From Swiss-Prot:
PROSITE patterns: AA_TRNA_LIGASE_I (PS00178). Belongs to the class-I aminoacyl-tRNA synthetase family. It comes from Bradyrhizobium sp. (strain ORS 278). The lineage of its organism: Bacteria, Pseudomonadati, Pseudomonadota, Alphaproteobacteria, Hyphomicrobiales. The gene is argS. It comes from the Bacteria. Disulfide bonds: none annotated. SMART domains: Arg_tRNA_synt_N, DALR_1. GO terms for molecular function: arginine-tRNA ligase activity; ATP binding. This is Arginine--tRNA ligase. NCBIfam families: argS.
Length: 598
């Protein structure tokens, strides 16, 4: 079990100090009681030349203090100058406060990394914090995973790991869409492959059915289990048999595809389970909303612009979504008496709340962006605003090879499968590059570029940083033979290093980057943006590689100084800090941290 960090990290520590100063000023200055300091932040300045940290305290508290922001900033700055961590304080512009820290701060930050090891940056669980449910992938069980599913899968998995690292209790969930019309289409497509397995010439696949070869094994399995008996059955009899078999086999394939990417789920929840058995959760949810006056019989006006698939010109049961922030009210029951997809989704989210989740996160594909407002309205309604829903939209992936679009596969029929991509470039390249752009931006994924061994390939550059660190350790044993090989023993040995020997500005820049890791984890977790970890790792690796390169040209900057064991030990401690943080961040992203690379 990994221990939790026990002390506040540098940015959190400085934030606490700023809060204490502001609280003292509030008390002495007669500010209103109960001032909320949560808007006060301490973060790196956009321009590194402005210092090591910056705070907006004066800007956001000036109104309560009944003072000009710059005047309040000067009061805060005066007290910060007396802090033992601070070397210099500047007030800039209308009232921003920039801080430069004492050089000794950075060696102390490295000492923290060496002391905490894998726990560095990890947040201890907060007692009573809401449980988090992250729903991702949730692809229809109608075929193999394609490259579009891949991005949402990696994003949801990495986000879940990030939130767990940040101290949250997270459940990873897959919602199986096994109750809609698409599974009947799947069954009819599989039945055609069953007839083919029996020796029939089925000709071209009719329009509207799934054309890919991936259903041929389903047809063979049906033949093995039932012989030709299904052919004598009426549709109503064979359809559920074929449907259940096809769904089961497709879900097995989907789970295999997810395993190839090391995508994990704690729960696979069936949509059909909401409406089958003795407890119809969808009907219950509609009754729940009816009792509160949140559904009514009404007629929707025709949609403006493009037609909406769920609009029908008739009197129907509607959810009063506009009362909870949506643009229009939403149908719950179709003209044939079946539930709309939305009705099932409402019941699903109510069921999550009943299971104890108050923080809900859904990962949607780009084609579901219009679904966000209605789902957030539904969650407000069925939880009395006691739960929140954050919807993260994952944009499209353009699959390229040397800049040219990749052709579709025969097996899938009309898309490139996730498995094909993983088999060609490897799991690590897929996972890292799917996270190396913000989720709501279109991603160009070039199969040739992601396996290049160059600085232009981020996954290689970051992994190579970890491998280079271990290479330095191996080489160092020639001049420092007492350096242990085993990681735990090596870290314990390096804790005794005299870190004050790390005095070069380039070394301090690298230590500053390491000190930023806990703050990066915190901000990425709060924003639900795991790409921030990927960006940070690339920046850290870049600074590490740059320092190594400088040592090639300037011998006094080399990590291993043959005639100075004390300095070598201090620099190896710095390398250990880099290796530990790279491994930690890569673990959050689900990417391997190799000790050596060819």
């Amino acid at each position: 079990m990994v221990e939790q960090a026990s002390t506040p990290y540098l940015f959190a520590d400085m934030l606490a100090r700023v809060h204490a100063i502001c609280a003292a000023l509030a008390k002495s200055g007669g500010w209103p009681e109960g001032i909320d300091f949560s808007r006060v932040v301490v973060e790196p300045p956009r321009d590194p030349s402005h210092g090591d940290m910056a705070t907006n305290a004066a800007m956001v508290l000036a109104k309560e203090a009944k003072a000009k922001p710059r005047d309040l900033a000067e009061q805060i700055a005066e007290r910060l100058r007396a802090d033992e961590l601070v070397a210099k304080v500047d007030v800039a512009g209308p009232g921003f406060i920039n801080l430069t820290l004492q050089p000794s701060v950075w060696s102390k930050a490295l000492a923290t990394i060496l002391r905490e090891g894998a726990a560095y940056g990890r947040v201890a669980p907060v007692p009573g914090a809401p449980k988090v449910n992250v729903e991702y992938v949730s692809a229809n069980p109608t075929g193999p995973m394609h490259v579009g599913h891949c991005r949402g899968a990696v994003f949801g998995d990495a986000l879940s790991s990030l939130l767990q690292f940040a101290g949250r209790d997270v459940t990873r969930e897959y919602y199986i869409n096994d109750a809609g019309a698409q599974v009947d289409v799947l069954a009819r497509s599989a039945y055609l492959r069953y007839r083919e397995a029996l020796g029939e010439d089925i000709g071209a696949i009719p329009e509207g059915l799934y054309p890919g070869d991936y259903l041929k094994p389903v047809g063979q399995a049906l033949k093995t289990e039932h012989g030709d008996k299904l052919k004598a059955m009426p549709d109503a009899q064979w359809l559920p048999i074929v449907r259940d078999k096809a769904i089961a086999m497709m879900m097995d394939e989907i789970k295999d595809d997810l395993a190839a990417l090391n995508i994990r789920h704690d729960v696979f929840f069936s949509e059909r389970s909401l409406i089958t058995g003795g407890n119809n959760k969808v009907a219950e949810t509609i009754d729940f909303l009816r009792e509160r006056g949140d559904v009514y019989e009404g007629r929707l006006p025709p949609p403006k612009g493009a037609p909406v698939e769920d609009w029908e010109d008739r009197e129907q049961l509607l959810f009063r979504a506009t009362a909870f922030g949506d643009d229009v009210d939403r149908p719950l029951i179709k003209s044939d008496g079946s539930y709309t997809y939305f009705a099932s989704d409402i019941a699903n989210h109510r069921h999550k709340f009943e299971r104890g989740f108050a923080d809900l996160i859904d990962v949607f594909g780009a084609d579901h962006g219009g679904y966000i407002k209605r789902m957030q309205a539904a969650v407000k309604a069925v939880t009395a605003a006691q739960a929140t829903l954050d919807v993260k939209v994952v944009q499209l992936v353009k699959l390229l090879r040397n800049g040219e679009p990749v052709k579709m596969s025969k097996r899938s029929g009309d898309f490139v499968t996730l498995r094909e991509v993983v088999d060609e470039v490897g799991r690590d390249a897929v996972r890292f590059m799917m996270l190396y752009r913000k989720n709501d931006a279109v991603l160009d994924f070039d199969l040739a570029k992601v396996i290049e061994q160059s600085k232009d390939n981020p996954v290689f550059y970051v992994q190579y940083g970890h491998a280079r660190g271990h290479s330095i350790f191996r080489n160092a044993r020639e001049s420092l033979p007492e350096l242990p090989e085993e990681e735990g023993a090596r870290i314990a040995f390096l804790r005794e290093a005299k870190l004050e020997r790390l005095a070069d500005s380039a070394e301090h820049d690298l230590l500053k980057r390491l000190a930023l890791y806990p703050r990066t984890v915190e901000s990425a977790a709060m924003a639900h943006e795991p790409h921030r970890i990927a960006f940070y790792l690339y920046e850290l690796a870049s600074e590490f590689h740059a320092l190594w390169t400088r040592g090639r040209d300037l011998p006094y900057l080399r990590f291993i100084i043959d005639d100075d064991a004390e300095l070598t030990k201090a620099r190896l401690a710095m390398v250990q800090g880099v290796v530990s943080v790279l491994a930690s961040g890569l673990a959050i992203l689900g990417v391997n941290a190799p000790d050596a690379m060819r």
